[in-house]
Structures are given as C-alpha cells and as structure tokens.
C-alpha cells in the first residue's frame, strides 16, 4: 500500500531480497523518480507462474508482466523481453527493487514503447551436488528449454526471434549475453546493464541483425571504457549498438534508467513480427524434491539457494569466482526435529522461539564460523512463526523463510503433515497468481491485491465464480499465498476434482480513513471491498458477477470482517467462511438475529455458511455454543 505521490527527499523502506539474504532497502525520492513511481495510469498485471527447470527439475516461479488490456485484446500476440537480475538477487528483484511494472505502465501510457510481456526468472540453475561457477552460470539451458517454451504455451506470444529480446543487470547481463550469443536464432535484441560479461562478445559472434544496448553508471569508469571498446567492435561488425552512461554507481538507479531507455528501442519493425510459428516444445519432468521446496518457499524467494559468492579473477583478469554453500537458517532434519542456524559473529547470546512449540538457546557452531546453531525436537505439525533474539534484540534470520505476521517481517517454519498434503507442490497444472492495483475510496491510496486464476484461464473464455479470501490480524495480502500456500492447495484440489474452478482474491484487510471514522479493529475494509475491489475484479476478470457465484472467507480478523461484510451485503454474497474468527449473533455493534435465528431466512440468504475453529482459541467456546 503506497502513497500515490511523494516529495523530494522522502525515504521509503522495504524488505527485499539481495546479497543472498532477506535485506532491508530504502529509496530516496529525487527530481527524476517519477518514471518508476506508481502513477494514476492504467496498470498492467504481474503474473506469478510456476514451471519446472530443465537443469535440476525444481519447480520455480517466474514473474510475468502483461500490459494493460492484455486480457481484453485476445486476438493480439505480444513480443517478450526476458529480463534477468544481478548476483545475490532473484526473480523478485526487477519487481520490488527495479519497479519494472511501473516503468512499463508509465511508458505505455505516454505512448513511448510497444506493448510487450516482460519475464523475470531466478537465474540460479544448479545441478545437485554441483560446485557451480559464479560466472556466467548455466541459466541458458533453463531459459531456452524450460522458460521460453513455458511462456509461449501459457501466454499469447510472438514465436520468432523478432519477437524476443533478452537483457539483464550485472550477472544477469552476462547470462543474457551468453544466451543471445549462443542462440542468435532466438533473440533479436540484447540489453547489457552494468555488464560484466563483455568478453562474451568476442567468444560468440552476435547475429548481424542483433540490436545491442550497453549501459553503465558514470562512476563505473573501467566498465565504461570496456563498453566503449565493445561498442566500437560491434559497430565494425555491422551490429546496431547503443551505449549510454547514467549518473550513478553499480546500483538500481542506473538499471531503472537503463530499462526505461532500452524498452523504447524494442520491437519496432511490425513486418518482422508477423511469423508466429511455434517450434520450442515444453518438456515434462518428475522430481522428489517438491516437499522440501514447499517447506522453504517464502514471499522473498520461491526456490531459495543457500549460497554466497567468492569473487575472484583468472590469470587474464576475467571473472572466475565460485558459489559457496551456506547453512540453511531453518533446516528440517526429520519429521519432528529442526536445526536452526543464525549468523551472528559478535553475539553473546542467541535464542530462537518457535511459536506454540518452545524456545531454544543456540550455541556457537563448530563447523561454520560466526554461526550459532541448535536443534529443537518434538515440534507440532503445521505452520509456526519463528523469532530470533540476539543479545535480547529481535532480528530476522535472512537465511530462513520470511513472511509478514504479527505486524512485522518474521520468519516461519512449516512442519509437514502426512495427513494433509494439499499444500505440497506437485508437477500438475498450475494456475497463475496476478498482482493487481486498484484505488481505495476509503483511504485514497493504491492497494495491491493478489488474484489466483485456475489453470486454463489464460487460454479459455469461460467465466468463473470468485472467492474473496482474507488474512488474519497482523498479516497482510501475502499471507494466504505464502504462509497459507493457497495456490498450491487450489492446484491440487482442482487436479483431484475436489474443488470447482474459481478465482481467488487476496487483499490487505487494513483500510483506515484519515479522519479516524473507521472501525477500530476491522477498519473500513468491508466498504472498500464492496465499493472498490469487487467492481475492479468484475471489470478486469471474467467473473460470474452475481451473489450466487461470489463468496468471502477469512481467518481470525479476516473471519470477523467476512461476517460483517457478508451479513451486511447479502445482495452480493451467498457463501461465507469464518475460520477461527468467531460467529456473532448479536453484540453492542450488530444484530444478526433476523438471519441466524430464522431458519427460512437463513436458507434464503446463504447457500453455505462454513464456520471452523480449533480446540484451543478464546473464540472456540462461544462459536461452538452459537453453532
């Protein structure tokens, strides 16, 4: 939830993934930040999609930007830019640090670039037990054998080299250069932002019709000289090559500007985009590592790599560093025991608290210098938040799954449940999860919601019912997706025929008006949902827009919001789910006796009211008495 505008010098802090860790970042606004800010313009969507790597058979996620109107213009095919992050970052980098989606929205609104898809993947593709080389890695195989076939199967793409471009920053630029050089038949343009792989231009002759864009920061002086030499060499060979230098260092300020200028050059020849023959085929794989992946996925990294980079150069001065393994912050040893590791070299005392399971004081590790370690057994199955204290100060473990809970960035652990396997990742058809922005009438701010669409939504034309699914107090719109693993569950239930196809919308439940008139606990989210979110979803998606095909559910606070919203808007909802949220018949604020104590009125109002609770919450006994 971000302000629609901000002033010079304003600082905006975030939790992102960088340097191979969960890490804090901040932005300072200046006079030239408008091009990557969230503006009041039509927004494209960012899809979160799953595919299987041809390199290691892991299920991985990629983020795919589709331009405004993509779903409406179903007769159009779009060119694709494959865009890679730098070392230590991952598939989320260009979305959260790079603001790619806002750069594209603003350029498209101004008519300065062509409509295109932008695909962002994690560039780490390691074989099991591999001693991987840092530069340039083997993402090329995953890109050409897994990612491109997947994208061209799932999205309406132009299937020729003139409809594909590849780019990246730092390490990602080396990976992009390697793929463009090895496969000139696949790509027509290459973007090298703060490129570290310029020697690859000498090893791989770029196709004569390859459009090449080089950029760097003004303080990357040696890199600038190398890029100028590289540009001269490429121009002499007949390539189209641009070189631009931006004020700055090896940093996101430079890379945002690079992307902004690069995409304006792409896909300008309409005639060359007409051939649309599919010749890259998607492969299928099997794997037994999906359970581990399920336990480790989080909001900052879907398929984490526990590595760091040891930088080095060879005798010729070329990059020759290697990846080195790092301990997992939380490591399941067996179905009941977990090992905890935290890097805190200057600490005197380190403690871990697994909610509902107990605390543990860690000891200095003998194997890993600077680390503290310990094992906790007899853990209850299921999901638990985890906190780490160093010398009595709460910290986030950057090498463990991270979510948002208890109104803070927080670690968590998932202990597998043998009798409840629906959340596990599987090699089955996967739906997409999209990021959507709408404006709240209650706060005047832009709101982000996540929207699950079932497999086949992209290529079909049918309409779907909608479930609005809310998180609990202290959590936010990402909770059901990462902690709750709702996309995995929906995929599995659909595959087994245990669930009807539906769209699932996940929102942040906080909508407090600036004048202080919102409900103190539940905020004005109910009003926002009814006035803003539902109309937006019904406009943007193929929904069955009536009460018979609209449901709402939530856990804890979200369950309370569900009852309040659904009972006050029975013209909009015929289905409701209250999970550990209590069920109110009448209190000092509301009176639902007319519905709940009148069987005929109840049956007329609801197709189903599903109320669930567990045995040890303060909400259980009142709920059971009411039911």
Which residues fall in each region the model found?
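The feature captures the conserved acid-bearing segment of alpha/beta-hydrolase catalytic domains
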Residues: 196-251, 584-619
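Primarily recognizes the serine-hydrolase "nucleophile elbow" in alpha/beta-hydrolase
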Residues: 160-206, 546-592
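C-terminal catalytic histidine-bearing segment of alpha/beta-hydrolase fold enzymes
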Residues: 220-286, 619, 625-627
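Short beta-strand element of the alpha/beta-hydrolase
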Residues: 76-86, 450, 462-472
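Single conserved hydrophobic/aromatic residue that forms the stacking wall/gate
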Residues: 1-8, 12, 618, 623-626
